[in-house]
Amino acid sequence: MLEIKNLNKKYGSGKVALKSVNLTLPSGQIVGLFGENGAGKTTMMKSILGFLKYDGDITIDGEKITHKNIARISFATSEHSFFPALTPEGHKAFYKEHFDTFREKRFSALMEFFELPMRRRVGSFSTGQKNQFEVLLALSQGA
């Protein structure tokens, strides 16, 4: 379970990005984070992932997030995290080698579900296909 309690973030300029955010997400939950520009979506994600200092508490199953348990969180963004020069086949090989939690069967099933080509460079995919592939990678990373 991911718990956020009284999350606050103020930037050096004095701008308040997050104020008293509280959120509880059960394990296995898939959620979308939507809001207007400047609403704090990216700031919240960067706080959860440990990229920003913040005030408040963010825990996974009652433990502070560390490099050891962060792999239990997967996310997809509109700023694609895949390697454009690799094919999906190349991504599968990379993730299998580098991430113990990578779920190869789920990856293959989602590739089939989205009807994406395995041997074409991801950078040549349409925008919609790139978005599908981004979600597919997030769902295949063992969270």
Predicted regions mapped to residue ranges:
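Short, conserved post-Walker A segment of ABC-type ATPase nucleotide-binding domains
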Residues: 31, 42-51
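ABC-family P-loop ATPase nucleotide-binding domains
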Residues: 77-133
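Conserved ABC transporter NBD signature motif
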Residues: 50, 54-69
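ABC ATPase nucleotide-binding domain "signature" region
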Residues: 32, 130-138
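Conserved structural motif at the start of ABC-family nucleotide-binding domains
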Residues: 2, 16-18
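Short coil-to-beta microelement around the adenine-binding A-loop and adjacent beta1/P-loop entry
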Residues: 14-16, 67
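The feature captures the beta-strand-to-loop junction immediately N-terminal to the Walker
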Residues: 34-36
